[in-house]
């Protein structure tokens, strides 16, 4: 950490920075994906949704959300812009899906407006799991105690979880000491 940075303001470059919700003037089509209902959003985001010209709206609460999301993204015409509103775990899952469908990062706005859920990728077993924003957790896959690093993979849409005690990674698991 340089002398110009202090622990209160330092933020690694890989940790996501989220933009304010604003319609893209150059977009011909506005695709809006919400984790929750519009009326559950803060008033400023409800106003953003109301101000979008003819948005195509998809809620994660709708039946068959995953299938509808893929259909929407693969059928999106040129000039579309995607706005994703939800917690960090949700917005990055949708981001990964959108990029898989061919959208560029410049065509996607992520608006983090949910709980403190985030995705953590275990570098030991490869499981990606949604967790509260904590510094340590036990992997649901391999049960190794992970330290969650302030390194975010945009490709995976997750923070990196690495073994907290690499010299004895599986000792607690073998002894049955790790809590689920």
Say what each PLM segment does.
Residues 1-118:
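FNR/FR-type flavoprotein reductase catalytic core
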Residues 96-180:
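Cys/His-clustered metal-coordination modules, chiefly Zn-binding fingers
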